Amino acid sequence: MFKNAFANLQKVGKSLMLPVSVLPIAGILLGVGSANFSWLPAVVSHVMAEAGGSVFANMPLIFAIGVALGFTNNDGVSALAAVVAYGIMVKTMAVVAPLVLHLPAEEIASKHLADTGVLGGIISGAIAAYMFNRFYRIKLPEYLGFFAGKRFVPIISGLAAIFTGVVLSFIWPPIGSAIQTFSQWAAYQNPVVAFGIYGFIERCLVPFGLHHIWNVPFQMQIGEYTNAAGQVFHGDIPRYMAGDPTAGKLSGGFLFKMYGLPAAAIAIWHSAKPENRAKVGGIMISAALTSFLTGITEPIEFSFMFVAPILYIIHAILAGLAFPICILLGMRDGTSFSHGLIDFIVLSGNSSKLWLFPIVGIGYAIVYYTIFRVLIKALDLKTPGREDATEDAKATGTSEMAPALVAAFGGKENITNLDACITRLRVSVADVSKVDQAGLKKLGAAGVVVAGSGVQAIFGTKSDNLKTEMDEYIRNH
């Protein structure tokens, strides 16, 4: 049961990365366009704002497509089925909800009582994915043969969406009310506590690759903002981009991603044994620059996560504290994907107290460096370069990586599902005991996570390319 649950949660987390991947361009367009910079012609600002806003307005549909593709090995039919399912489900609720709630349709629409948001998109995507996996090989009588196989999937998905829409018309209002209550509490009533908890739990979920699921309600659901054109935005990211002065509560990520973790990487480098310091320095400086520029932190985190869990617990606590600090000091900036220098500069149009970020950030860096340096020495933690015995990894060329990786995962017969997100290979295997974790690390994995039949190998931003190479190798050999 646990094996299947973790494998499915892995797929959910991975599938959410496709819609999240459109946020950078949408965020830049909406953020820059809404900022109304004096050096940018008004018509250009308007076009950019409308273009970016259109993506955020259709996020439920984009999430529906992403979830469907994530559970069907990127089969395009499931994406079409997800679009059909979402459209039918929404319209079904629009008709049935007024009958259930005994309220005019206009009042239901104005109060968003039947608005399922991105969660509705995820539900629609799940319907399409389930129907695809269940019916894509279905055989029908000869006179209905045209609708057999994959063509049947959008049809059955649409029918299932009608049933789902009717059911949601009854159960969604109380669920939506609870979500709205939490949204109001987190966004407006007590954001200090809410985002402190968010930051801590989000880091705790990183080792399992499940943080993408936790991010969705905070990034795309909480709070509500209506701009001058009457467009409604939900979620901290879209609201900030649209110019909501109460948004930007996710800004704490800049403190530990641009300053804290890079300082921790330097502390690990300085703590390495003299004979290993040059080698470790190259790795850590590269990881620190990645975190500082892009906000991608896994290369640093996985270097100490398993060998020194006490450091990771402290890091999770400091990450959680970063969000309340920014909120209490009135520091706001925007993020579209992660909290790196690129986001910090490009999305600063609606920011507040931008000058405080480097000041507080340097203070955070000092805290991180001091804690890591002291604890590594005092507890003799085996961070990179301090191992009792090290074995040099053999350099492996790009052309050799695919077969070596397949072999490390136990051979192609042992691989039951192959996928990747931004920083990690996500592989389901038949027999975990056949996976060579040491071999994966020699090939460059910053860490390996095993839970049930799911194996995650953290290779950084090249993971998706490695997945493509492995997929081609498996098909051709």
Swiss-Prot record:
Gene3D superfamilies: Glucose permease domain IIB. Pfam families: PTS_EIIB (PF00367), PTS_EIIC (PF02378). It catalyses: N(pros)-phospho-L-histidyl-[protein] + D-glucose(out) = D-glucose 6-phosphate(in) + L-histidyl-[protein]. Induction: Induced by glucose. Expression is positively regulated by the cAMP-CRP complex and negatively regulated by the Mlc transcriptional repressor. Mlc and CRP-cAMP bind independently to the ptsG promoter region, and the action of Mlc is dominant over the cAMP-CRP action. The ptsG transcript is degraded under conditions of glucose-phosphate stress (due to intracellular accumulation of glucose-6-phosphate caused by disruption of glycolytic flux), or in the presence of (toxic) non-metabolizable glucose phosphate analogs due to hybridization with the small RNA sgrS (originally known as ryaA). The modification Phosphocysteine is found at C421. GO terms for cellular component: membrane; plasma membrane; transmembrane transporter complex. Its EC number is 2.7.1.199. It is an enzyme of class 2 (transferase). The active site is at C421 (phosphocysteine intermediate). Transporter activity may be inhibited by SgrT. It is found in: Cell inner membrane. Residues 36-50, 101-111, 173-190, 271-279, 331-355 are periplasmic. GO terms for molecular function: D-glucose transmembrane transporter activity; kinase activity; protein-N(PI)-phosphohistidine-sugar phosphotransferase activity; protein-phosphocysteine-glucose phosphotransferase system transporter activity. It comes from the Bacteria. Keywords: Cell inner membrane, Cell membrane, Kinase, Membrane, Phosphoprotein, Phosphotransferase system, Sugar transport, Transferase, Transmembrane, Transmembrane helix, Transport. GO terms for biological process: D-glucose import across plasma membrane; D-glucose transmembrane transport; phosphoenolpyruvate-dependent sugar phosphotransferase system; regulation of DNA-templated transcription. Homodimer. The dephosphorylated form interacts with the Mlc transcriptional repressor. Mlc and the EIIB domain form a complex with the 1:1 stoichiometry. PANTHER family: CYTOCHROME C-TYPE SYNTHESIS PROTEIN AND PTS TRANSMEMBRANE COMPONENT, PTS SYSTEM GLUCOSE-SPECIFIC EIICB COMPONENT-RELATED. This is PTS system glucose-specific EIICB component.
